A protein has these predicted regions:
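Alpha-helical solenoid repeat scaffolds of the TPR/TPR-like class and their adjacent stem/linker regions
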Residues: 1-328
Length: 328
C-alpha cells in the first residue's frame, strides 16, 4: 500500500529510524507480510540492535521459509553477535536456496575466517570469484586469510589484485601496508599507510602503524603532526596506537592507561570465584603465549622453565601461534 511504499522510500534514503517507526505501525496491522518483517528487521540490523533484528528475521522466515535474503541477513546479525557457527548455518541455508548467492558465499568466508577455518574460507572466496571475479572485496578477504596462514606471497598478490580492481580501496592499502611492514619493507609500508589515510583515516591503529614504521627507519618527517593526531585521538577514546609504541613517544601515564584499556579486547568473562579445587601434591603452572617459537619471548623465558623446582611444580607451556619451527 501507499504507506508501505512511503516507508520503503524513506528507508532507501537512509532515514532508518523514521522508516522503522512506520514499519512497526504496519506490522501491528498485518502478520502475514514476510517482506515487511524483513525490512523492519533490516532497520534493526542497520541500527546495530542485533537481537531485535534476529527476532524479526525469525518472523519473516516463519511466514516464508524459503526466503534466502532473510537467512543471509539473519546470518549477518548472528555474526555481529560473534555467533560464527550459527551464522555459517544461516549462510548455508541461503546458499542452498540460491546457489549463486554472492553475498552469502562472501559472508560465509568471513565467518569461517573468524573460526580459523582458513581453508574452508578460501573455498568460499573461490566460489565468490566464480560468481563475480571483478569484486575487490573478495581478493582483500583472501589476502587476509593468506596472511594468517603465513603465505605472504599469495597474500601480496591478492592485495595487489584488490587494489588493481579498486584504486581507492583503503582496506586493501592498509592490509598491504601491514604486510610490507611484517616483511621488512618499511618504505613500501609507509607509502601504503599514507595512501590509506588519504582515502579513509579512521581505521583502528592506522596512525600507530605509520609512526612506528617511520621510527624503524629514523624517518622523522611530519613527526610532530602525527604525535598530535594520535594524542588527540586518544583523548576521545579512539584506538590510535599500540600501548607499547606510545610508551616510547610521550610521557603521559593517563594516556598510556587509556591506550591500554582501548587495546584490551575482553574475550571472556572472568570467573567470579573458584569454589572447589583438587588437592594436589604439585602446583600446576601453565604458560600461554603466541610466541613460544623461535622468538625473543621464548628465548627469554627458557631459563624460567628450566629453573622451576620440579619436585613442587608441574610446568606446562601452551602455544597459540600459527608459525611452526623446531621450537614448537
Amino acid at each position: 500500500n501507499e504507506i508501505f511504499e512511503k516507508a520503503f522510500k524513506i528507508h532507501l534514503k537512509g532515514k532508518i529510524k523514521e522508516a522503522q517507526k512506520i514499519y512497526l505501525k504496519l506490522v501491528k496491522k498485518t502478520e502475514k507480510n514476510h517482506n515487511l518483517f524483513f525490512l523492519l528487521a533490516t532497520t534493526y540490523l542497520q541500527s546495530e540492535d542485533y537481537d531485535k533484528a534476529i527476532n524479526f528475521f525469525n518472523k519473516s522466515i516463519d511466514i516464508k521459509s524459503n526466503f534466502a535474503d532473510a537467512y543471509n541477513n539473519r546470518g549477518i546479525a548472528l555474526y555481529k553477535l560473534k555467533m560464527y557457527q550459527e551464522s555459517i548455518e544461516d549462510f548455508n541455508r541461503a546458499i542452498k536456496l540460491k546457489e549463486n548467492y554472492f553475498d552469502a558465499h562472501l559472508n560465509k568466508g568471513i565467518s569461517l575466517r573468524n573460526l580459523r577455518k582458513y581453508y574452508e574460507a578460501i573455498q568460499s572466496y573461490q566460489n565468490c570469484i566464480k560468481l563475480k571475479s571483478h569484486d575487490a572485496k573478495i581478493y582483500n578477504n583472501l589476502a587476509n586469510v593468506f596472511v594468517e596462514l603465513g603465505n605472504y606471497d599469495k597474500a601480496l598478490k591478492s592485495f595487489n589484485k584488490a587494489i588493481q580492481l579498486n584504486k581507492n580501496y583503503a582496506e586493501a592499502y592498509f592490509g598491504r601496508g601491514k604486510l610490507f611492514s611484517l616483511n621488512k619493507h618499511p618504505k613500501l609500508a609507509i607509502k601504503d599507510f599514507e595512501n590509506t589515510i588519504k582515502i579513509k583515516d579512521d581505521f583502528d591503529f592506522l596512525y600507530g602503524h605509520l609512526i612506528h614504521t617511520k621510527m624503524r627507519i629514523c624517518d622523522w618527517s611530519n613527526y610532530e603532526s602525527l604525535i598530535k593526531k594520535i594524542v588527540n585521538g586518544v583523548k576521545i577514546n579512539k584506538k590510535m596506537i599500540d600501548p607499547f609504541c606510545l610508551l616510547s613517544l610521550i610521557d603521559d601515564p593517563k594516556k598510556h592507561r587509556i591506550t591500554s584499556e582501548l587495546s584490551f579486547n575482553k574475550q571472556t568473562e572472568l570467573p567470579s570465584s573458584i569454589k572447589n579445587f583438587s588437592q594436589l601434591n604439585k602446583i600446576k603452572i601453565g604458560y600461554f603465549s603466541g610466541d613460544l617459537c623461535d622468538h625473543a619471548i621464548l628465548h627469554l623465558t627458557l631459563d624460567i622453565f628450566k629453573h622451576h623446582d620440579k619436585s613442587k611444580f608441574d610446568v606446562y607451556a601452551f602455544y597459540s601461534g600459527l608459525k611452526e619451527d623446531k621450537w614448537t
